[in-house]
Structure formats: C-alpha cells, structure tokens
Amino acid sequence: MATKRDYYEVLGLAKGASDDEIKKAYRKLSKKYHPDINKEADAEEKFKEVSEAYEVLSDPQKKAAYDQYGHAGTDPNYGGGAGGFGGFGGGGFSSSGFGGFEDIFDSFFGGGGGRSVDPNAPRQGADLQYTIQLKFEEAIFGVEKEIKYNREDTCATCGGNGAKPGTHPETCHKCHGSGTINVERQTPLGRMMSRQTCDVCHGTGKEIKEPCPTCHGTGHEKKAHTVKVNVPAGVEDGQQMRLANQGEAGTNGGPYGDLYVVFRVEDSDIFDRDGAEIYYDLPVSFVQAALGDEVTVPTVHGDVKLKIPAGTQTGTNFRLRGKGAPRLRGGGNGDQHVKVKLITPKNLNEEQKDALRAFAKAGGQNVTEQQEEGFFDKMKDAFGGKKKK
C-alpha cells in the first residue's frame, strides 16, 4: 500500500497555511483534476487525494490533530466517521477487498503466523459518484433535487447469496472455504510455496451448484435508484456531499457503499463569486460619477439602492454587507462588492459635443478632437488613396 503524501504537500502549501490559502488551493486543484474535466488516467486518484487533504485541513479539529500527529491523528482506521457535507469523496472506489500487510506477506511466503482474511466476512459495497448541475441562484439559496441512477442492489430473489431459491451455497471443495490455495513454484531460490486465489470459487470460499436465475450467482442485480438530495444553501462549485448507504450493495451481508454527490454550479451572467463573497461591476456614466447619484444595484437577494458620491472614480469599490452568499458552516451571509465601471459615451450628437467642449473650456482644458472620416475619405483609404504623411 502506497504511503500517503503530506496533506500540505498535496495542496502545494507550506505547513501552517491559512484557511483562505487552503480553500483557494483546493478550489484550483479540484477543478484541475476533476474526472468530469480532466481525462488523464491518474486524474481521479489525484482528485481524491486533493479532496481528502481538504477534508482534513479545512476542519479546525482535524487540522489540529493532523498538525500534531500526522496521518495517525486523522486515519479513519482509528475511528468511524458519519456521513455529511464536505470536500472529501470520489466515484467508483472502495477500500473493501484490500487486505493488510500481513496478507501480502503471507501470499508470498505462505506463512502460518499471519492473520488470514475470511472470504465470507461481510464487505461494504462500492462507493458511487453523481454530478448535479445547479443554477447560480440554486447554489446560493439551496434546493431539493431528485436524482436517479443505476446501482447494484442486493438480489431480491436469492437475498444476496447467489443460489437458486431452495438451495444454498456450499463450501468450496478445493480451498475448503478459505478462498485461497497454496501453490508450489520453482524459483531461482528453489521451490517455494505461494498463496493465490482459488480457481474454483474465485476467492469466495463457496460453490454455487444451482445459480439464482435472476442474478446468475452474483448476489446482486442492477436496479434504478431514486434519492432526494437537499442541497445546502451556499454550496460552491466542486464541493461534494456524502450520502451514506446510497452506493452499491455489499457482499456477504455487508453494508451498502456511499454516494458522493458532486455539485457543478453554472456561472451567473452578472455576478462573480468567491466563497460567500459576491462581486458585481456597476456601469456608471461620467456625469453620475462627477455629480453623484443614487442608483439601483441588483443583488441575489433583490435590488438595493446605492448612493454614488460626487467625484467617484472608476474602480471605486462599495460593500453591501450581508448581500452575499450564505456561509456553508454558519455565520450568516457574506457581502456583495460593487465595483464602479465608468462608461464612456459613444456616438455623441452635436449638442452633446458642444456641452463637452464648454465643459473642457471652463476647466481650462485644450482638447484636440479627432475628426471622423467622411464617406469619400473612407473609400480613398480602402483603395489605397490615403496620402502618406
């Protein structure tokens, strides 16, 4: 089993990075490696690695434990975790079915002192992943979505044992229920014993003489499954929610796997968003900026009035407190940031031009106007008749 990389290293950060640095690094890397976007072979593994790192470092308690004890402080083998919302997850993966170091050692040397895996022990089913598309406003305020997907369910005909009703699986005659057999091989070091999966029962430890007519001996059947997902207010693009026991059926009576719902949020036509903060560019005429005005500003919570002071410059920022998105972990709403964008008028009529000339003259400005070309001048230019200066 590969050694886990340092979580700070995974996110490209130094130890002790701030919450904002952790969040920004996660958003950048989760988008880069998301399987829906990145089709490289190792993208899914990197995505899961990034998500796992963020799940720990974004939680103050887990981060403190990790900073003090490393992976030992957050390893799930040290205690179970409940379902919930966070940055951790992935699709089509499960840790069930992997033995420990003792199993690997035992498979090479056929040792009798190491522990063995019971092939008939309950095993959790595989996890699944589902992507939900959200409108910008749905992510802000939350919404209930009903999703449908196919998953492996426990076979209703045989109850999951794979045998025809009225019959039962029998202990494998070759491996005697262990799921593995010892094989003697000739190696450069001489003849050695190794352990491999039983070729009769394929590691299950059981033989099914009369398979179930529905699942054909697998114990599972593919079925459509429907789940209602309560999308929390303030969810961001790329974040995930774990729905416990909504994945695929387990084996030998093991629990269902989990479903990881990935949220993809559409862009807004007028707003930008960074976490709970929302940004809006406000178009303002130079007259409004010079003389001041009261304008209407759209927010996700409805229109509000904003006073523009006289002499406002382009690029000036105003803050509308509480008009941003809800903070996912509580603490109210973020703010909306309004940036003034000065609009220069085009296609002025003569009256407007005269007014501007008078304004410039009153201010002591000497403006050299650029004259527009007439129709015949443009025709000359098109046919190379423009005089060289």
Curated annotation (Swiss-Prot):
Keywords: Chaperone, Cytoplasm, DNA replication, Metal-binding, Repeat, Stress response, Zinc, Zinc-finger. Residues 6-70 form the J domain. Pfam families: DnaJ (PF00226), DnaJ_C (PF01556), DnaJ_CXXCXGXG (PF00684). GO terms for molecular function: ATP binding; heat shock protein binding; unfolded protein binding; zinc ion binding. Zn(2+) 1 binds at residues 155, 158, 212, 215. It is found in: Cytoplasm. The keyword Transport does not apply. The keyword Repeat applies. CXXCXGXG motif repeats lie at residues 155-162, 172-179, 198-205, 212-219. GO terms for biological process: chaperone cofactor-dependent protein refolding; DNA replication; protein refolding; response to heat. Zn(2+) 2 binds at residues 172, 175, 198, 201. SMART domains: DnaJ. Its main location: cytoplasm. GO terms for cellular component: cytoplasm. Its cofactor is Zn(2+). CDD domains: DnaJ, DnaJ_C, DnaJ_zf. A zinc finger (CR-type) spans 142-224. Binds 2 Zn(2+) ions per monomer. InterPro entries: DnaJ, DnaJ_C, DnaJ_domain, DnaJ_domain_CS, HSP40/DnaJ_pept-bd, HSP_DnaJ_Cys-rich_dom, HSP_DnaJ_Cys-rich_dom_sf, J_dom_sf. PANTHER family: CHAPERONE PROTEIN DNAJ (PTHR43096:SF48), DNAJ HOMOLOG 1, MITOCHONDRIAL-RELATED (PTHR43096). Participates actively in the response to hyperosmotic and heat shock by preventing the aggregation of stress-denatured proteins and by disaggregating proteins, also in an autonomous, DnaK-independent fashion. Unfolded proteins bind initially to DnaJ; upon interaction with the DnaJ-bound protein, DnaK hydrolyzes its bound ATP, resulting in the formation of a stable complex. GrpE releases ADP from DnaK; ATP binding to DnaK triggers the release of the substrate protein, thus completing the reaction cycle. Homodimer. Belongs to the DnaJ family. This is Chaperone protein DnaJ.
